[in-house]
């Protein structure tokens, strides 16, 4: 343990925080181009075919991004908007694709939680 005199001479350095989404380089979102659109299987105990895309960002980095919602229209060369946010049961997937932005269409017939999937408010019947 250091003495008070040693701490006066050289104070304690604060711990550096590592970013959870370094490829975005401190931006809220980044534009990218889909290289591949595939499915991945989650970790135990879950079972599914989760839709993911390999995306080359405008920074030049390649990341794996999750495509949320039911159904999508993405294919190779689609331009997408990528935000941070990991998928807990998919190792290595630390980014999400923003639905309803650029080439990625919104989820059809979405009634609740629409803002997360880019869906417009449905017309009310009178």
UniProtKB/Swiss-Prot annotation:
GO terms for molecular function: rRNA binding; structural constituent of ribosome; tRNA binding. GO terms for cellular component: small ribosomal subunit. SUPFAM superfamilies: Nucleic acid-binding proteins. The modification 3-methylthioaspartic acid is found at residue 89. Part of the 30S ribosomal subunit. Contacts proteins S8 and S17. May interact with IF1 in the 30S initiation complex. PANTHER family: 30S RIBOSOMAL PROTEIN S12 FAMILY MEMBER (PTHR11652). This is Small ribosomal subunit protein uS12. It comes from Protochlamydia amoebophila (strain UWE25).
